[in-house]
Amino acid sequence: MQTTVTTMLLASVALAACAGGGSTPLPLPQQQPPQQEPPPPPVPLASRAACEALKDGNGDMVWPNAATVVEVAAWRDAAPATASAAALPEHCEVSGAIAKRTGIDGYPYEIKFRLRMPAEWNGRFFMEGGSGTNGSLSAATGSIGGGQIASALSRNFATIATDGGHDNAVNDNPDALGTVAFGLDPQARLDMGYNSYDQVTQAGKAAVARFYGRAADKSYFIGCSEGGREGMMLSQRFPSHYDGIVAGAPGYQLPKAGISGAWTTQSLAPAAVGLDAQGVPLINKSFSDADLHLLSQAILGTCDALDGLADGIVDNYRACQAAFDPATAANPANGQALQCVGAKTADCLSPVQVTAIKRAMAGPVNSAGTPLYNRWAWDAGMSGLSGTTYNQGWRSWWLGSFNSSANNAQRVSGFSARSWLVDFATPPEPMPMTQVAARMMKFDFDIDPLKIWATSGQFTQSSMDWHGATSTDLAAFRDRGGKMILYHGMSDAAFSALDTADYYERLGAAMPGAAGFARLFLVPGMNHCSGGPGTDRFDMLTPLVAWVERGEAPDQISAWSGTPGYFGVAARTRPLCPYPQIARYKGSGDINTEANFACAAPP
Protein backbone atom coordinates (compact mmCIF):
# COMPACT_ATOMS: atom_id res chain seq x y z
CA MET A 1 0.00 0.00 0.00
CA GLN A 2 1.23 3.49 -0.77
CA THR A 3 1.38 6.17 1.87
CA THR A 4 -0.08 9.47 0.70
CA VAL A 5 1.70 12.53 1.96
CA THR A 6 -1.23 14.87 2.50
CA THR A 7 0.85 17.86 3.57
CA MET A 8 2.59 18.15 0.21
CA LEU A 9 1.67 20.94 -2.21
CA LEU A 10 3.39 20.21 -5.40
CA ALA A 11 3.49 22.49 -9.06
CA SER A 12 3.12 21.16 -12.55
CA VAL A 13 5.94 20.26 -14.83
CA ALA A 14 5.92 19.35 -18.49
CA LEU A 15 7.58 16.40 -20.10
CA ALA A 16 10.96 17.31 -21.61
CA ALA A 17 13.38 15.45 -23.92
CA CYS A 18 20.38 -7.77 -38.90
CA ALA A 19 22.22 -9.29 -37.07
CA GLY A 20 25.89 -8.78 -36.59
CA GLY A 21 28.86 -10.45 -38.16
CA GLY A 22 29.26 -13.01 -35.36
CA SER A 23 27.84 -16.48 -35.24
CA THR A 24 27.22 -17.13 -31.54
CA PRO A 25 23.47 -17.33 -30.99
CA LEU A 26 22.45 -16.80 -27.38
CA PRO A 27 20.03 -19.32 -25.79
CA LEU A 28 16.85 -17.75 -24.54
CA PRO A 29 15.40 -19.29 -21.36
CA GLN A 30 11.63 -19.44 -21.54
CA GLN A 31 9.72 -17.37 -19.02
CA GLN A 32 6.11 -16.47 -18.30
CA PRO A 33 4.82 -13.18 -19.78
CA PRO A 34 5.35 -10.15 -17.53
CA GLN A 35 2.58 -9.37 -15.07
CA GLN A 36 1.52 -6.06 -13.62
CA GLU A 37 3.97 -4.34 -11.30
CA PRO A 38 3.34 -5.27 -7.64
CA PRO A 39 2.09 -2.51 -5.34
CA PRO A 40 4.96 -0.51 -3.91
CA PRO A 41 5.91 -0.89 -0.26
CA PRO A 42 4.78 1.81 2.17
CA VAL A 43 7.08 4.76 2.62
CA PRO A 44 7.55 6.98 5.67
CA LEU A 45 5.59 10.20 5.88
CA ALA A 46 7.44 13.16 4.46
CA SER A 47 6.66 16.83 4.73
CA ARG A 48 7.11 20.21 3.12
CA ALA A 49 9.81 20.82 5.68
CA ALA A 50 11.66 17.67 4.63
CA CYS A 51 11.72 18.97 1.07
CA GLU A 52 12.79 22.49 1.94
CA ALA A 53 15.47 21.15 4.29
CA LEU A 54 17.31 19.93 1.22
CA LYS A 55 17.98 23.55 0.30
CA ASP A 56 21.42 24.82 1.25
CA GLY A 57 21.47 26.33 4.71
CA ASN A 58 18.56 24.24 6.00
CA GLY A 59 18.86 21.02 7.96
CA ASP A 60 21.99 18.91 8.10
CA MET A 61 21.93 17.16 4.71
CA VAL A 62 25.35 15.73 3.88
CA TRP A 63 25.89 15.33 0.14
CA PRO A 64 28.24 12.66 -1.27
CA ASN A 65 30.13 15.48 -2.99
CA ALA A 66 30.66 18.42 -0.66
CA ALA A 67 30.73 20.74 -3.68
CA THR A 68 26.97 20.33 -4.15
CA VAL A 69 24.78 23.42 -4.21
CA VAL A 70 20.99 23.14 -4.08
CA GLU A 71 19.29 25.99 -5.89
CA VAL A 72 15.66 24.83 -5.75
CA ALA A 73 13.88 22.68 -3.18
CA ALA A 74 10.15 23.20 -3.57
CA TRP A 75 6.77 21.48 -3.55
CA ARG A 76 5.06 21.02 -6.90
CA ASP A 77 1.34 20.44 -7.35
CA ALA A 78 -0.07 17.48 -9.23
CA ALA A 79 -0.49 18.14 -12.95
CA PRO A 80 -3.39 16.80 -15.03
CA ALA A 81 -2.86 14.64 -18.09
CA THR A 82 -2.54 16.31 -21.48
CA ALA A 83 -2.57 14.96 -25.03
CA SER A 84 1.20 14.48 -24.86
CA ALA A 85 1.87 13.75 -21.19
CA ALA A 86 0.45 11.57 -18.45
CA ALA A 87 -0.78 13.12 -15.23
CA LEU A 88 1.98 13.85 -12.74
CA PRO A 89 1.69 13.38 -8.98
CA GLU A 90 2.45 16.02 -6.40
CA HIS A 91 6.13 15.89 -5.60
CA CYS A 92 9.22 17.56 -4.22
CA GLU A 93 11.53 19.10 -6.83
CA VAL A 94 15.20 19.54 -6.01
CA SER A 95 17.60 21.05 -8.51
CA GLY A 96 21.18 22.15 -8.12
CA ALA A 97 24.75 21.83 -9.30
CA ILE A 98 27.87 19.90 -8.40
CA ALA A 99 31.49 21.01 -8.73
CA LYS A 100 31.20 24.55 -10.08
CA ARG A 101 34.48 25.57 -11.68
CA THR A 102 36.17 27.43 -14.54
CA GLY A 103 37.53 25.33 -17.38
CA ILE A 104 40.87 25.74 -19.12
CA ASP A 105 38.94 27.41 -21.95
CA GLY A 106 37.83 30.18 -19.57
CA TYR A 107 34.18 29.13 -19.53
CA PRO A 108 32.23 28.23 -16.35
CA TYR A 109 31.20 24.61 -15.86
CA GLU A 110 29.05 22.70 -13.39
CA ILE A 111 27.16 19.40 -13.27
CA LYS A 112 23.50 20.33 -13.07
CA PHE A 113 20.81 17.97 -11.84
CA ARG A 114 17.08 17.96 -11.25
CA LEU A 115 15.35 15.44 -8.97
CA ARG A 116 11.63 14.84 -8.46
CA MET A 117 10.33 12.80 -5.51
CA PRO A 118 6.62 11.92 -5.57
CA ALA A 119 4.37 12.08 -2.53
CA GLU A 120 3.21 8.53 -3.24
CA TRP A 121 6.54 6.82 -3.87
CA ASN A 122 6.83 3.29 -5.25
CA GLY A 123 10.22 2.77 -3.62
CA ARG A 124 12.14 2.98 -6.90
CA PHE A 125 14.81 5.39 -8.22
CA PHE A 126 14.98 6.26 -11.93
CA MET A 127 17.48 8.18 -14.05
CA GLU A 128 16.73 9.28 -17.59
CA GLY A 129 19.51 9.39 -20.16
CA GLY A 130 20.66 12.32 -22.22
CA SER A 131 20.76 12.99 -25.95
CA GLY A 132 23.10 14.43 -28.56
CA THR A 133 26.10 15.78 -26.70
CA ASN A 134 23.90 16.74 -23.73
CA GLY A 135 24.20 20.28 -22.39
CA SER A 136 20.52 20.67 -21.54
CA LEU A 137 18.80 19.88 -18.24
CA SER A 138 15.45 18.23 -18.95
CA ALA A 139 12.31 18.48 -16.86
CA ALA A 140 13.44 15.18 -15.28
CA THR A 141 10.01 13.60 -15.26
CA GLY A 142 11.64 10.31 -16.24
CA SER A 143 11.16 9.79 -19.97
CA ILE A 144 10.90 6.06 -20.67
CA GLY A 145 11.27 6.35 -24.47
CA GLY A 146 9.43 4.26 -27.02
CA GLY A 147 7.03 7.11 -27.77
CA GLN A 148 5.29 6.67 -24.42
CA ILE A 149 3.12 9.36 -22.88
CA ALA A 150 3.63 7.85 -19.44
CA SER A 151 6.79 8.78 -17.57
CA ALA A 152 8.56 7.24 -14.62
CA LEU A 153 7.32 10.08 -12.41
CA SER A 154 3.74 9.47 -13.51
CA ARG A 155 4.30 5.90 -12.27
CA ASN A 156 5.56 7.20 -8.92
CA PHE A 157 9.28 6.63 -9.35
CA ALA A 158 11.69 9.19 -7.91
CA THR A 159 13.28 10.60 -11.07
CA ILE A 160 16.50 12.44 -11.84
CA ALA A 161 18.36 13.89 -14.84
CA THR A 162 21.59 15.77 -15.54
CA ASP A 163 22.95 18.05 -18.25
CA GLY A 164 26.16 16.02 -18.45
CA GLY A 165 28.38 18.71 -16.95
CA HIS A 166 28.06 21.55 -19.46
CA ASP A 167 25.38 24.02 -20.51
CA ASN A 168 24.65 24.68 -24.19
CA ALA A 169 23.44 28.16 -23.31
CA VAL A 170 26.68 29.01 -21.50
CA ASN A 171 29.38 26.89 -23.13
CA ASP A 172 28.54 28.04 -26.66
CA ASN A 173 31.64 29.23 -28.49
CA PRO A 174 30.96 30.25 -32.12
CA ASP A 175 34.68 29.99 -32.90
CA ALA A 176 34.74 26.39 -31.65
CA LEU A 177 31.67 24.96 -33.40
CA GLY A 178 29.10 26.31 -30.96
CA THR A 179 27.54 24.10 -28.33
CA VAL A 180 30.06 21.27 -28.77
CA ALA A 181 32.82 23.60 -27.55
CA PHE A 182 32.90 21.96 -24.11
CA GLY A 183 35.34 19.51 -25.73
CA LEU A 184 38.03 22.18 -25.36
CA ASP A 185 38.04 21.46 -21.62
CA PRO A 186 39.46 18.07 -20.53
CA GLN A 187 37.32 17.77 -17.38
CA ALA A 188 34.15 18.65 -19.29
CA ARG A 189 34.93 15.74 -21.60
CA LEU A 190 35.21 13.37 -18.64
CA ASP A 191 32.05 14.74 -17.05
CA MET A 192 30.13 14.17 -20.27
CA GLY A 193 31.67 10.72 -20.71
CA TYR A 194 31.00 9.23 -17.29
CA ASN A 195 31.67 11.40 -14.24
CA SER A 196 28.45 13.44 -14.21
CA TYR A 197 26.22 10.33 -14.17
CA ASP A 198 28.14 8.88 -11.24
CA GLN A 199 28.01 12.15 -9.30
CA VAL A 200 24.33 12.77 -9.98
CA THR A 201 23.32 9.19 -9.20
CA GLN A 202 25.03 9.41 -5.83
CA ALA A 203 23.49 12.79 -5.08
CA GLY A 204 20.03 11.66 -6.10
CA LYS A 205 20.12 8.50 -4.03
CA ALA A 206 21.33 10.44 -0.99
CA ALA A 207 18.50 12.96 -1.33
CA VAL A 208 15.93 10.19 -1.76
CA ALA A 209 17.17 8.43 1.39
CA ARG A 210 17.02 11.69 3.32
CA PHE A 211 13.59 12.70 2.07
CA TYR A 212 11.82 9.35 2.51
CA GLY A 213 13.83 8.11 5.47
CA ARG A 214 15.11 5.06 3.63
CA ALA A 215 17.00 4.12 0.48
CA ALA A 216 15.32 3.09 -2.76
CA ASP A 217 14.60 -0.62 -3.13
CA LYS A 218 15.62 -0.75 -6.79
CA SER A 219 17.16 1.67 -9.27
CA TYR A 220 16.52 1.94 -13.01
CA PHE A 221 18.03 3.78 -15.98
CA ILE A 222 16.54 4.31 -19.44
CA GLY A 223 18.10 6.20 -22.34
CA CYS A 224 18.39 6.19 -26.11
CA SER A 225 21.19 7.37 -28.42
CA GLU A 226 23.68 9.15 -26.14
CA GLY A 227 21.43 8.00 -23.32
CA GLY A 228 21.77 4.43 -24.55
CA ARG A 229 25.54 4.79 -24.42
CA GLU A 230 25.23 6.11 -20.89
CA GLY A 231 23.26 3.01 -19.92
CA MET A 232 25.91 0.68 -21.32
CA MET A 233 28.63 2.76 -19.67
CA LEU A 234 26.92 2.53 -16.28
CA SER A 235 26.72 -1.28 -16.53
CA GLN A 236 30.48 -1.33 -17.17
CA ARG A 237 31.96 1.48 -15.02
CA PHE A 238 29.42 1.69 -12.20
CA PRO A 239 27.75 -1.75 -12.04
CA SER A 240 26.30 -1.19 -8.57
CA HIS A 241 24.40 2.00 -9.41
CA TYR A 242 21.45 0.50 -11.30
CA ASP A 243 19.54 -2.79 -11.05
CA GLY A 244 17.88 -2.44 -14.45
CA ILE A 245 19.04 -0.60 -17.57
CA VAL A 246 17.43 0.02 -20.96
CA ALA A 247 19.96 1.12 -23.59
CA GLY A 248 18.35 2.12 -26.89
CA ALA A 249 20.25 2.82 -30.12
CA PRO A 250 23.45 3.16 -28.09
CA GLY A 251 26.29 5.28 -29.45
CA TYR A 252 28.63 3.07 -27.49
CA GLN A 253 31.56 3.81 -29.79
CA LEU A 254 30.41 7.18 -31.02
CA PRO A 255 33.89 8.45 -31.97
CA LYS A 256 34.04 5.63 -34.54
CA ALA A 257 30.55 6.46 -35.76
CA GLY A 258 31.82 9.99 -36.39
CA ILE A 259 34.46 8.58 -38.71
CA SER A 260 31.65 6.84 -40.56
CA GLY A 261 29.95 10.21 -40.99
CA ALA A 262 32.91 11.54 -42.95
CA TRP A 263 32.93 8.33 -45.01
CA THR A 264 29.26 8.57 -45.97
CA THR A 265 29.69 12.25 -46.86
CA GLN A 266 32.62 11.57 -49.18
CA SER A 267 30.93 8.47 -50.63
CA LEU A 268 27.73 10.32 -51.54
CA ALA A 269 29.48 13.41 -52.93
CA PRO A 270 29.90 12.07 -56.52
CA ALA A 271 26.10 11.75 -56.77
CA ALA A 272 25.50 15.29 -55.48
CA VAL A 273 24.05 17.94 -57.77
CA GLY A 274 25.42 21.44 -57.22
CA LEU A 275 27.60 23.09 -54.59
CA ASP A 276 26.89 25.00 -51.40
CA ALA A 277 28.15 28.50 -50.63
CA GLN A 278 31.53 27.10 -49.55
CA GLY A 279 31.96 25.08 -52.75
CA VAL A 280 31.12 21.75 -51.07
CA PRO A 281 28.94 19.26 -52.98
CA LEU A 282 25.31 19.43 -51.87
CA ILE A 283 24.99 15.97 -50.34
CA ASN A 284 21.25 16.48 -49.87
CA LYS A 285 20.87 16.63 -53.65
CA SER A 286 22.44 13.20 -54.20
CA PHE A 287 19.07 11.45 -53.72
CA SER A 288 15.65 13.00 -53.96
CA ASP A 289 12.90 11.83 -51.62
CA ALA A 290 11.48 9.81 -54.52
CA ASP A 291 14.90 8.27 -55.25
CA LEU A 292 15.31 7.17 -51.65
CA HIS A 293 11.79 5.76 -51.60
CA LEU A 294 12.59 3.83 -54.79
CA LEU A 295 15.58 2.30 -52.99
CA SER A 296 13.39 1.41 -50.01
CA GLN A 297 10.84 -0.27 -52.27
CA ALA A 298 13.59 -2.27 -53.99
CA ILE A 299 14.76 -3.48 -50.57
CA LEU A 300 11.23 -4.63 -49.83
CA GLY A 301 11.03 -6.29 -53.24
CA THR A 302 14.11 -8.35 -52.43
CA CYS A 303 13.74 -8.88 -48.70
CA ASP A 304 10.15 -8.48 -47.52
CA ALA A 305 9.10 -12.10 -48.04
CA LEU A 306 12.32 -13.59 -46.63
CA ASP A 307 10.59 -13.87 -43.25
CA GLY A 308 7.65 -15.74 -44.79
CA LEU A 309 5.28 -12.78 -45.13
CA ALA A 310 5.21 -9.78 -47.48
CA ASP A 311 3.93 -7.08 -45.15
CA GLY A 312 6.17 -4.04 -45.61
CA ILE A 313 8.53 -5.08 -42.80
CA VAL A 314 11.90 -6.81 -43.27
CA ASP A 315 11.93 -9.07 -40.23
CA ASN A 316 14.63 -11.39 -41.61
CA TYR A 317 17.18 -8.61 -41.64
CA ARG A 318 20.16 -10.96 -41.58
CA ALA A 319 19.12 -12.71 -44.80
CA CYS A 320 18.41 -9.32 -46.36
CA GLN A 321 21.99 -8.12 -45.95
CA ALA A 322 23.19 -11.07 -48.03
CA ALA A 323 20.38 -10.91 -50.58
CA PHE A 324 20.15 -7.21 -51.46
CA ASP A 325 22.44 -5.43 -53.90
CA PRO A 326 21.16 -2.21 -55.51
CA ALA A 327 23.30 -2.93 -58.58
CA THR A 328 21.33 -6.10 -59.35
CA ALA A 329 17.99 -5.48 -57.59
CA ALA A 330 14.74 -4.81 -59.42
CA ASN A 331 12.22 -2.02 -59.12
CA PRO A 332 9.20 -4.02 -57.88
CA ALA A 333 6.80 -1.55 -59.50
CA ASN A 334 7.82 -2.48 -63.04
CA GLY A 335 10.16 -5.45 -62.71
CA GLN A 336 12.94 -3.52 -64.41
CA ALA A 337 16.46 -3.08 -63.04
CA LEU A 338 16.79 -0.63 -60.14
CA GLN A 339 20.04 0.66 -61.68
CA CYS A 340 19.38 2.66 -64.82
CA VAL A 341 20.53 1.04 -68.05
CA GLY A 342 20.36 4.32 -69.93
CA ALA A 343 19.54 7.82 -68.76
CA LYS A 344 18.28 8.49 -65.22
CA THR A 345 14.51 8.32 -64.92
CA ALA A 346 12.04 8.39 -62.06
CA ASP A 347 11.93 4.57 -62.15
CA CYS A 348 15.64 3.87 -61.61
CA LEU A 349 18.78 5.06 -59.84
CA SER A 350 21.80 6.20 -61.82
CA PRO A 351 24.97 4.07 -61.72
CA VAL A 352 26.63 6.94 -59.85
CA GLN A 353 23.91 6.86 -57.18
CA VAL A 354 24.14 3.08 -56.85
CA THR A 355 27.93 3.17 -56.49
CA ALA A 356 27.69 5.98 -53.94
CA ILE A 357 25.12 4.32 -51.68
CA LYS A 358 26.86 0.92 -51.83
CA ARG A 359 30.17 2.49 -50.76
CA ALA A 360 28.52 4.46 -47.97
CA MET A 361 26.59 1.47 -46.60
CA ALA A 362 29.68 -0.76 -46.57
CA GLY A 363 31.23 1.39 -43.82
CA PRO A 364 34.58 3.19 -43.59
CA VAL A 365 37.96 1.58 -44.18
CA ASN A 366 41.51 2.91 -44.36
CA SER A 367 43.85 2.50 -47.33
CA ALA A 368 44.79 -0.99 -46.10
CA GLY A 369 41.13 -2.03 -46.09
CA THR A 370 40.89 -2.17 -42.29
CA PRO A 371 37.34 -1.42 -41.10
CA LEU A 372 37.06 1.75 -39.02
CA TYR A 373 33.40 1.27 -38.04
CA ASN A 374 30.65 -1.18 -38.92
CA ARG A 375 28.53 -1.57 -42.03
CA TRP A 376 24.92 -0.37 -42.22
CA ALA A 377 21.75 -2.41 -42.69
CA TRP A 378 19.70 -2.36 -45.88
CA ASP A 379 16.20 -1.80 -44.50
CA ALA A 380 12.90 -0.38 -45.70
CA GLY A 381 13.05 2.40 -43.10
CA MET A 382 15.62 4.24 -45.21
CA SER A 383 12.49 5.89 -46.57
CA GLY A 384 8.75 5.29 -46.29
CA LEU A 385 5.62 7.01 -47.55
CA SER A 386 2.59 7.78 -45.42
CA GLY A 387 -0.04 9.37 -47.60
CA THR A 388 1.97 11.95 -49.53
CA THR A 389 4.62 12.46 -46.84
CA TYR A 390 8.06 10.90 -47.16
CA ASN A 391 9.83 9.68 -44.04
CA GLN A 392 12.76 12.00 -43.27
CA GLY A 393 14.22 10.08 -40.33
CA TRP A 394 17.05 8.33 -42.19
CA ARG A 395 17.93 11.05 -44.66
CA SER A 396 18.13 13.77 -42.00
CA TRP A 397 21.36 12.17 -40.77
CA TRP A 398 23.11 11.26 -44.03
CA LEU A 399 21.62 13.57 -46.66
CA GLY A 400 19.65 16.41 -45.15
CA SER A 401 16.43 17.85 -46.54
CA PHE A 402 16.35 17.71 -50.33
CA ASN A 403 15.02 21.22 -50.89
CA SER A 404 17.70 22.93 -48.81
CA SER A 405 20.21 25.18 -50.56
CA ALA A 406 22.80 24.32 -47.92
CA ASN A 407 24.30 21.14 -46.51
CA ASN A 408 22.23 20.43 -43.43
CA ALA A 409 22.63 16.71 -42.64
CA GLN A 410 23.78 15.88 -39.13
CA ARG A 411 26.74 13.86 -40.45
CA VAL A 412 27.78 16.49 -43.00
CA SER A 413 27.66 19.74 -41.05
CA GLY A 414 25.43 19.17 -38.02
CA PHE A 415 26.30 18.38 -34.41
CA SER A 416 27.36 14.82 -35.32
CA ALA A 417 30.16 16.16 -37.52
CA ARG A 418 30.95 19.10 -35.23
CA SER A 419 31.22 17.00 -32.09
CA TRP A 420 33.76 14.69 -33.71
CA LEU A 421 36.06 17.62 -34.43
CA VAL A 422 35.93 19.28 -31.01
CA ASP A 423 34.84 16.59 -28.56
CA PHE A 424 36.40 13.39 -29.90
CA ALA A 425 39.46 14.42 -31.89
CA THR A 426 42.54 14.92 -29.71
CA PRO A 427 43.74 17.56 -29.77
CA PRO A 428 40.41 19.24 -30.57
CA GLU A 429 39.93 21.06 -33.88
CA PRO A 430 37.94 24.26 -33.27
CA MET A 431 36.78 26.15 -36.36
CA PRO A 432 33.84 28.22 -37.60
CA MET A 433 30.75 26.16 -38.34
CA THR A 434 30.80 27.16 -42.01
CA GLN A 435 33.95 25.06 -42.48
CA VAL A 436 32.63 21.73 -41.15
CA ALA A 437 31.31 20.23 -44.40
CA ALA A 438 34.56 21.08 -46.20
CA ARG A 439 36.53 19.47 -43.36
CA MET A 440 34.47 16.28 -43.68
CA MET A 441 35.26 16.21 -47.40
CA LYS A 442 39.00 16.41 -46.59
CA PHE A 443 38.89 13.75 -43.86
CA ASP A 444 41.91 11.43 -44.19
CA PHE A 445 40.97 7.85 -43.27
CA ASP A 446 44.58 6.88 -42.58
CA ILE A 447 45.45 9.83 -40.34
CA ASP A 448 42.31 11.31 -38.78
CA PRO A 449 40.93 8.10 -37.17
CA LEU A 450 44.05 7.92 -35.00
CA LYS A 451 42.82 11.04 -33.19
CA ILE A 452 40.12 9.15 -31.28
CA TRP A 453 42.83 7.02 -29.64
CA ALA A 454 45.23 9.90 -29.00
CA THR A 455 46.08 11.87 -25.84
CA SER A 456 47.69 15.29 -25.76
CA GLY A 457 48.82 17.59 -22.93
CA GLN A 458 46.01 17.96 -20.41
CA PHE A 459 43.84 15.63 -22.49
CA THR A 460 45.11 12.53 -20.70
CA GLN A 461 42.33 10.18 -21.82
CA SER A 462 41.52 9.38 -25.44
CA SER A 463 37.93 9.81 -26.53
CA MET A 464 37.52 6.05 -26.91
CA ASP A 465 38.63 5.76 -23.27
CA TRP A 466 36.39 8.40 -21.73
CA HIS A 467 33.42 8.05 -24.06
CA GLY A 468 33.53 4.46 -25.33
CA ALA A 469 31.39 1.81 -23.66
CA THR A 470 32.75 -1.27 -25.40
CA SER A 471 33.63 -3.63 -22.54
CA THR A 472 32.06 -7.09 -22.56
CA ASP A 473 33.03 -7.76 -18.95
CA LEU A 474 29.71 -7.26 -17.21
CA ALA A 475 30.39 -9.81 -14.47
CA ALA A 476 29.96 -7.31 -11.64
CA PHE A 477 26.66 -6.08 -13.08
CA ARG A 478 25.42 -9.64 -13.64
CA ASP A 479 26.55 -10.95 -10.28
CA ARG A 480 24.56 -8.36 -8.34
CA GLY A 481 21.42 -9.28 -10.28
CA GLY A 482 21.58 -6.50 -12.86
CA LYS A 483 19.43 -6.80 -15.99
CA MET A 484 19.80 -4.93 -19.27
CA ILE A 485 17.56 -4.54 -22.32
CA LEU A 486 19.12 -3.18 -25.49
CA TYR A 487 17.08 -2.14 -28.52
CA HIS A 488 17.96 -0.65 -31.90
CA GLY A 489 16.07 0.38 -35.03
CA MET A 490 17.35 -1.37 -38.14
CA SER A 491 17.09 1.89 -40.13
CA ASP A 492 19.03 3.96 -37.61
CA ALA A 493 21.28 6.33 -39.58
CA ALA A 494 23.11 7.68 -36.52
CA PHE A 495 24.50 4.40 -35.15
CA SER A 496 24.51 1.09 -36.99
CA ALA A 497 22.11 -1.52 -35.61
CA LEU A 498 24.53 -4.12 -36.95
CA ASP A 499 27.19 -2.66 -34.68
CA THR A 500 24.98 -3.13 -31.63
CA ALA A 501 24.21 -6.69 -32.75
CA ASP A 502 27.96 -7.32 -33.08
CA TYR A 503 28.49 -6.05 -29.52
CA TYR A 504 25.79 -8.40 -28.27
CA GLU A 505 27.41 -11.35 -30.00
CA ARG A 506 30.78 -10.42 -28.48
CA LEU A 507 29.08 -10.24 -25.10
CA GLY A 508 27.65 -13.72 -25.63
CA ALA A 509 31.07 -15.08 -26.58
CA ALA A 510 32.74 -13.45 -23.56
CA MET A 511 29.99 -14.34 -21.09
CA PRO A 512 28.19 -17.60 -21.96
CA GLY A 513 24.57 -17.44 -20.90
CA ALA A 514 24.46 -13.66 -21.29
CA ALA A 515 20.80 -13.85 -22.31
CA GLY A 516 20.13 -14.55 -18.64
CA PHE A 517 20.83 -10.90 -17.83
CA ALA A 518 21.03 -8.99 -21.15
CA ARG A 519 18.79 -9.13 -24.21
CA LEU A 520 18.76 -7.26 -27.51
CA PHE A 521 15.61 -6.34 -29.42
CA LEU A 522 16.08 -5.13 -33.01
CA VAL A 523 13.22 -3.12 -34.53
CA PRO A 524 12.80 -3.46 -38.32
CA GLY A 525 11.91 -0.23 -40.10
CA MET A 526 12.61 2.03 -37.13
CA ASN A 527 14.91 5.01 -37.45
CA HIS A 528 17.04 6.57 -34.71
CA CYS A 529 15.23 5.82 -31.43
CA SER A 530 11.81 6.25 -33.08
CA GLY A 531 9.97 6.89 -36.33
CA GLY A 532 9.97 5.10 -39.66
CA PRO A 533 7.85 2.30 -41.14
CA GLY A 534 8.08 -0.05 -38.20
CA THR A 535 6.49 -0.73 -34.82
CA ASP A 536 8.38 2.05 -33.07
CA ARG A 537 6.17 2.45 -29.99
CA PHE A 538 6.77 0.26 -26.93
CA ASP A 539 7.09 0.24 -23.15
CA MET A 540 10.45 -1.16 -22.01
CA LEU A 541 10.13 -0.12 -18.36
CA THR A 542 7.38 -2.57 -17.38
CA PRO A 543 9.20 -5.70 -18.64
CA LEU A 544 12.45 -4.42 -17.16
CA VAL A 545 10.91 -4.12 -13.70
CA ALA A 546 9.35 -7.58 -14.07
CA TRP A 547 12.76 -9.03 -14.98
CA VAL A 548 14.63 -7.33 -12.15
CA GLU A 549 12.09 -7.83 -9.40
CA ARG A 550 10.36 -11.09 -10.34
CA GLY A 551 12.87 -12.83 -12.58
CA GLU A 552 10.52 -12.77 -15.59
CA ALA A 553 12.82 -12.43 -18.60
CA PRO A 554 11.26 -10.68 -21.62
CA ASP A 555 10.62 -13.32 -24.30
CA GLN A 556 8.86 -10.69 -26.39
CA ILE A 557 7.84 -7.07 -26.01
CA SER A 558 4.63 -5.63 -27.41
CA ALA A 559 5.06 -2.84 -29.95
CA TRP A 560 2.87 -0.82 -32.28
CA SER A 561 3.33 1.58 -35.15
CA GLY A 562 3.31 5.29 -34.41
CA THR A 563 2.52 5.98 -38.09
CA PRO A 564 0.51 3.04 -39.44
CA GLY A 565 -0.12 5.05 -42.60
CA TYR A 566 3.23 3.74 -43.83
CA PHE A 567 1.45 0.40 -44.20
CA GLY A 568 -1.85 1.83 -45.40
CA VAL A 569 -3.70 0.65 -42.29
CA ALA A 570 -5.27 2.22 -39.24
CA ALA A 571 -3.15 0.30 -36.73
CA ARG A 572 -0.43 -2.34 -36.57
CA THR A 573 0.97 -4.23 -33.59
CA ARG A 574 3.82 -6.72 -33.50
CA PRO A 575 6.02 -8.48 -30.96
CA LEU A 576 9.63 -7.36 -30.67
CA CYS A 577 11.78 -10.46 -30.31
CA PRO A 578 15.02 -11.15 -28.43
CA TYR A 579 17.98 -11.54 -30.76
CA PRO A 580 18.50 -13.70 -32.75
CA GLN A 581 14.79 -14.52 -32.97
CA ILE A 582 12.43 -12.62 -35.28
CA ALA A 583 8.66 -12.13 -35.43
CA ARG A 584 7.14 -14.83 -37.65
CA TYR A 585 3.57 -15.01 -38.90
CA LYS A 586 1.64 -17.99 -37.52
CA GLY A 587 -0.07 -18.50 -40.89
CA SER A 588 -3.55 -17.15 -40.24
CA GLY A 589 -5.28 -14.10 -38.86
CA ASP A 590 -4.88 -10.36 -39.28
CA ILE A 591 -1.28 -9.52 -40.23
CA ASN A 592 -1.63 -6.25 -38.34
CA THR A 593 -2.26 -7.97 -35.00
CA GLU A 594 0.54 -9.02 -32.65
CA ALA A 595 -1.26 -12.17 -31.48
CA ASN A 596 -0.86 -13.72 -34.93
CA PHE A 597 2.94 -13.64 -34.70
CA ALA A 598 5.42 -15.60 -32.61
CA CYS A 599 9.08 -15.06 -31.82
CA ALA A 600 11.12 -17.81 -33.48
CA ALA A 601 14.37 -18.49 -35.29
CA PRO A 602 14.56 -17.05 -38.84
CA PRO A 603 13.60 -19.46 -41.65
Curated annotation (Swiss-Prot):
InterPro entries membership: AB_hydrolase_fold (IPR029058), Tannase/feruloyl_esterase (IPR011118)
Biotechnology (record note): Has potential for application in environmental remediation and biological recycling of PET waste products.
Source organism per UniProt: Piscinibacter sakaiensis (Ideonella sakaiensis)
A UniProt-annotated Pfam family: Tannase
Residues binding Ca(2+): D304, D307, L309, D311, I313
Lipidation (S-diacylglycerol cysteine): C18
Covalent lipidation (N-palmitoyl cysteine), chain numbering: C18
Topology in the lipid bilayer: Lipid-anchor
Outcome reported for the amino acid change (mutating S416A): Gains a low activity towards BHET (bis-(2-hydroxyethyl) terephthalate)
Name under which the protein is recorded: Mono(2-hydroxyethyl) terephthalate hydrolase
Keyword Cytoplasm included in the entry's annotation: no
GO molecular function: carboxylic ester hydrolase activity; metal ion binding
Residue stretches in coiled coil: none
GO biological process terms on file: xenobiotic catabolic process
